[in-house]
């Protein structure tokens, strides 16, 4: 097994890694860097749970071998787009629309939608559906309406038409029962 030294920028941090060129990008992210938000469902590029952003493009990392990742690539994963105190508009919209029933597909959908909104800041419902079809993002729990609704609302936030707070539930009596915890990836 011949190892390969790579320079990558992952979630804004420059990294020097020694990788097996035959390993998938998903394996390297999950096993070497412990970025487990990149989910591996099918290992065949069919479900989209492993979608990350590579040099500005949504890619299915479970089928991308490290030998095909260019040196000095810029990689974004779900861990790099928001913080517990400052979530990305897509993450807020995902919560607001109840998009994460089991949550397994959410990181892949969010990363895919992030690229969509960078390329098209005002997509139609049909453009969003088509994007998810072309990029093979699948969800077996929610159906797709809440996912499309979330992308529409996140786009409004990113265009400045809404604030993130506008998407969140406000109880009428100003009381929420229970405790809020940051959800791990």
Please tell me what each predicted stretch does:
Residues 1-185:
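Signature of N-terminal electron-transfer/Fe-S-associated modules in redox systems
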